Amino acid sequence: MTRGPGERPELADAGPAVLVAVEDRIATVTLNRPRARNALSRAVMHGLWDAVAAAGDDPGVAAVILTGADPAFCAGIDLKEVAGDAPPAVPPRDPGLGPGRDTNGLFRFLPVIGKPVIGAVNGVAVTGGLEVALQCTFLVASQRARFADTHARLGVMPGGGITVLMAQSMGLRRAIELSLTGNFLTADEALRLGLVNHVVPHEELLPFTRRLAGDIAGNDQDAVRRLLQHYRQVASAATLDEAHLIEGYLAETWRPGMTQVAGRRAAVTARGRAQASDAD
């Protein structure tokens, strides 16, 4: 089964922006703009939201896997679209009907569902792509995976939870270093720091992740949902909600010119690719 909105012909890859396949009670959601390194265009964000929401509503689905079409997991927000170089392929949605800022200030790329969403990170997860990964329940990484937060390089503020979720995963000081430098982490470094749960050979990424999802699907689903709810309540303590609100406020009030951001895009991309290549 596949579904998802189409994209502009000049930028489109084969097929819809997001692919969905359901098998053995596991929904595999794939970002499908490989030529654009699965950048988050509006079409991709809407397709991703709809796919995860549909899996959450489907009684035949017990777990979700989120991955990207090789070679990247997700290179972040589509800066060409943001800068106006290429108009969005789909219209905006009303608040609450798709990706957007939550009541606690967090910009949600993924809806909150009562099922685990396991991120299978197959390549680079950069900035907005890293935020998508962090909004997953937990992560499995290919040996080809690379992680970076380039908000400071671009001169924009994060809004998707990096300053909270990354600090929770790997510790405050490590998260600060990653954000302020914009440097890349290898998959093994991400494992050592606690950002990901497992690192596996690239060809084993989806089979390994499917086995984990199958283990979850084989458990009592009421217990799974209740455990997820409890963990989320612990992670959403008042101080963290306040942190999300602060990050959301910074993101909403920081308004660099889109021309300036677009002008930095090429340099940031070149530097990131060089670092990712050096890590191989």
Residue ranges of predicted features:
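C-terminal alpha-helix plus adjacent terminal tail
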Residues: 1-24, 182-187, 207, 211-280
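Conserved CoA-thioester-binding segment of acyl-CoA-metabolizing enzymes
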Residues: 1-71
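An acidic, glycine-rich surface segment that forms the CoA-thioester-binding/catalytic face
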Residues: 45-49, 53-56, 79-122, 247, ...
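Short, active-site-adjacent cap segments at secondary-structure transitions
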Residues: 71-75, 126, 231-234
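Crotonase-fold acyl-CoA enzyme core
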Residues: 108-222
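Hydrophobic/aromatic residues within transmembrane alpha-helices
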Residues: 29, 66, 78, 132-133, ...
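A general structural signal for well-ordered alpha-helical segments in protein cores
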Residues: 79, 103, 163, 172-175, ...
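Glycine-rich phosphate-binding loop at the start of an alpha helix
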Residues: 76, 100-104, 127, 184
